[in-house]
Swiss-Prot record:
The second albumin domain forms a deep binding pocket that contains palmitoleic acid (in vitro). Palmitoleic acid is most likely not the physiological ligand. Instead, this pocket may accomodate the covalently bound lipid moiety of Wnt family members. One of its GO terms (biological process) is protein transport within extracellular region. Residues 596-608 have a biased composition (Basic and acidic residues). Residues 22-210, 211-403, 404-599 form the Albumin domain. Residues 583-608 are annotated as: Disordered. Residues 215-319 are annotated as: Binding pocket for hydrophobic ligands. Residues 1-21 form the signal peptide. It comes from Mus musculus. This is Afamin.
Length: 608
């Protein structure tokens, strides 16, 4: 390919020092050299990703100016890498360039970051990223003919602009994913622009690219949120569960070594350090492929692919078969007399090994459920090990595991039952109401997006054999989007509590959330009047958006409304919309208690 070459990982600013250890084995040296091989065309892409993700508001012209600064800097360091400025890490150099561009920090409100140095500055830039990109204009779309003409006129500029638009709308997506997306998009443009049916071709090619980007974004944001809010121990627990389920024959010692590379990868990638992210991900993939015989029989084809394609292939590869003779229980954690002593001697290693053994034996469970069981086990041992007869106590811990799993399973069964009975549209309205009750502070666009994601999760999973793990995993990712990546995101006390108290049990926490009643309630008549005016306002707008806004406003103003009440009102407004006639007897939708609440609210309003 002309611009994005998938034959090796892209690396730039070679003279800059990085924190990863230098390899010593010949095969590792070869891989390291391949990773460090500089491909000049791709310097621009990595720079665009970094600048666009750190300052999403920056214009394309501003990003292009910064890229030129980067290229000049690279050339100076190539010519003389002993210059003091060339000893910086790539990420520090990138942030220096952002801060040094005249007027840019003030214009885009990140000057407070430029007053910091080192880790505090890197963290500040990270916290400055915005997951909700509603402040950006809609993604620019071109007619397929115009798109192809622009691509033929100047393919490099066309692809640079595409990379800029995608990167700033996906500020937490790792650089290797964005590079792969851009490469696939270039392949699509090259192919489709030669076709008669260009629009059909682009649609077919775009679907898997969009799906890959969306899935990667959701998972990476969730894991980075866990790292930022709960620290490296929770991140390690997630990775132990994920890798043990996928590669059940890997030994615990080998897994521990692999996860050292994985943890390093997430630290750099989550922070937005594009160079560290690419290099460390390359190291993880190389580690897996160099030991594939002892890790998995399912990844041989993946390891033969081009480097950027390997990761996606390994992620999507089937789970390896459970080793023969592996029992469903590991006795050392429930039957041994020395459980408490082993826990006390090295708690981190002990519980990591527990997750490893339990996960490889129960690949049917979701990652969140495996973390819940681990938390139950930790709490149970805390109690048992303080008793006179600990062994007699913790022998019954399996009962607690089963109770926890049954609670989670019941939630999934209820959600899939709703999916089967309600249909997609009604189900989305159900979740829209549910999310709005819990978090009325969120903008409508975000609430609609969350409800769509839940419906998509159930649509994907509720007909599968591994329904439970699939739904629980994807539903947890939706909550990860609600909670956000940054520690400084706050919604309301109840939601914040669920998001920040216990990563493993946040889904259970959300399930029991009541409506946030801190919102003020207008009278029923004022509510109906406002909703009717909005409903009948002539706008060039999709009817579905009006329906969504109707429900969101209804619930924001009346958080105590029941399912029957909002459904009744929704039906009445829908029936009246054709002629925008008066809504017939809207008050009849409300129970006496609801009417009373509305009257009390009206009385309160008069007192102000």
């Amino acid at each position: 390919m002309r611009h994005l070459k998938l034959t090796g990982f892209i690396f730039f600013l070679l003279p800059l020092t990085e924190s990863l250890a230098l390899p010593t084995k010949p095969q590792d040296v070869d891989h390291f050299n391949a990773t460090q091989k500089f491909i000049d065309e791709n310097t621009t892409y990595l720079a665009i990703i970094a600048f666009s993700q750190y300052v999403q508001e920056a214009s394309f012209d501003e990003v292009e100016t910064l890229v030129k600064v980067m290229l000049d800097y690279r050339d100076r360091c190539w010519a003389d890498n002993t210059l003091p400025e060339c000893s910086k890490t790539a990420n520090d150099a990138i942030q220096d360039m952002l801060c040094d561009m005249e007027g840019l920090p003030q214009k885009h409100n990140f000057s407070h970051c430029c007053g910091k140095a080192g880790f505090p500055r890197r963290l500040c830039f990270f916290y400055n990223k915005k997951a909700n990109v509603g402040f950006l204009p809609p993604f620019p779309t071109l007619d397929p003919e115009e798109k192809c003409q622009a691509y033929k006129n100047n393919s490099e500029s066309f692809l640079h602009l595409y990379m800029y638009e995608v990167a700033r709308r996906n500020p937490f997506v790792f650089a290797p994913v964005l590079l792969a997306v851009a490469a696939w998009f270039e392949e699509a443009a090259t192919t489709c622009c030669e076709q008669q049916q260009k629009a059909t071709c682009f649609q077919a090619k775009a679907a898997p690219i969009t799906q890959y980007l969306k899935a990667s974004s959701s998972y990476q944001r969730n894991v980075c949120g866990a790292l930022i809010k709960f620290g490296p121990k929770v991140l390690n627990s997630i990775n132990v569960a994920v890798f043990s389920k996928k590669f059940p024959k890997i030994g615990f010692k080998d897994l521990t070594t692999l996860l050292e590379d994985v943890s390093s990868m997430y630290e750099g990638c989550c922070e937005g350090d594009v160079v560290h992210c690419i290099r460390s991900q390359s190291q993880v993939v190389n580690h897996i492929c160099s030991k594939q015989d002892s890790i998995s029989s399912k990844i041989k084809v993946c390891c033969e692919k081009k480097t950027l394609e390997r990761e996606a292939c390994i992620i999507n590869a089937n789970k390896d078969d459970r080793p023969e003779g592996l029992s469903l229980r590991e006795a050392k954690f429930t039957e041994s007399e020395n459980v408490c002593q082993e826990r006390d001697s090295d708690p981190d290693k002990f519980f990591a090994e527990f997750i490893y053994e339990y996960s490889r034996r129960h690949p049917d469970l979701s990652t969140p459920e495996l973390l819940r069981i681990t938390k139950v086990y930790m709490d149970f041992l805390e109690d048992c090990c303080s008793r006179e007869n600990p062994a007699g106590c913790y022998r019954h811990v399996e009962d607690k595991f089963n109770e926890t799993t049954q609670r989670s399973l019941a939630m999934v069964q209820q959600e899939c039952k709703q999916f089967q009975e309600l249909g997609k549209d009604t189900l989305q309205r159900h979740f829209l109401v549910k999310f709005t009750k819990a978090a009325p502070q969120l903008p409508m666009e975000e609430l609609v997006s969350l409800s769509k994601e839940m419906v998509a999760a159930l649509t994907t999973c509720c007909t599968l054999s591994d329904e439970f793990a699939c739904v629980d995993n994807l539903a947890d990712l939706v909550l990860g989007e609600l909670c956000g990546v940054n520690t400084n995101r706050t919604i309301n006390p109840a939601v914040d509590h669920c998001c920040k108290t216990d990563f493993a049990f946040r889904r259970h926490c959300f399930e029991h959330l009541k409506a946030d009643t801190t919102y003020e309630l207008p009278s029923v008549s004022a509510l109906v009047s406002a909703l009717h005016t909005d409903w009948c306002q002539p706008r060039k707008e999709d009817l579905q958006n009006k329906k969504h806004r109707f429900l969101v406003n209804l619930v924001k103003w009346m958080p105590g409304i029941t399912d029957e009440e909002w459904l009744c009102l929704f039906t009445k407004f829908t029936a009246a919309r054709e002629e925008c006639s008066e809504v017939q007897e809207p008050e009849s939708c409300f129970s006496p208690e609801s009417s009373k609440t509305g009257d009390e609210s009206q009385a309160t309003e008069k007192q102000r």
